[in-house]
Amino acid sequence: MEKLDLIAGATIALDKPLTWSSFSLVNKFRCEACRYLGIKKLKVGHAGTLDPLATGVMILGTGKHTKRIDELQAGRKEYIADIRLGQTTPTFDMETEPDAFFPTEHITREAVEEALKGFIGTIEQVPPAFSAVKVDGRRAYDLARKGRDFELKAKTLVIDEIELLDYALPQIQIRVVCSKGTYIRALARDIGTALSSGGHLTDLRRTRVGDYRIEDCYRVEDIQAFLREYVALPTEDTEHSNP
């Protein structure tokens, strides 16, 4: 296998750890790569942000491959999501404490499977208030944290597949294949609403982005070994061509 030239450009798939921000993962890879290559800077970007409480596939592009970010982000994404029915939180996940509680005794496995069918295809989804969506030039999460009132417009998305993997009330686990821009936190909210019971995300793992699967990803603790085995050290020519 020909070694990768990170300076000229390469695409790498990493498994983002729990609690790490997408920026932290990019910064970690950049620092490790610069140290290995003996350079001071390296252009690195990522395709598709993951919340700190989510794990899984994160695609990084270096050098000229940063120009492929939009193309990579447009790929279909697959997630495994755990949803807690019967309660809601302001952020639609476990970042905040529950703010409302609802009964779940009426929810059968058949009811969940029927509700999930209603989300397949083209749907309209209102993003979470605690999100990076911009409202009059400001991030929605900044306004939400300050207690400001505002409305977010629904976005048109596509859910290609949605499957119930586990049913153990009040928890359910689903697999989702969807288009760019889908908020699985918002999907958890909407599934809870469809079942006449609130819902919020308790765990989220992205298992695919386009053709990149979780099995193809390197863990953070394996970055140094990956660099040594698969990345070419720079020559004088490549050092001077750093984008």
Descriptions of predicted regions:
Residues 1-243:
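Catalytic/RNA-binding core of pseudouridine synthases
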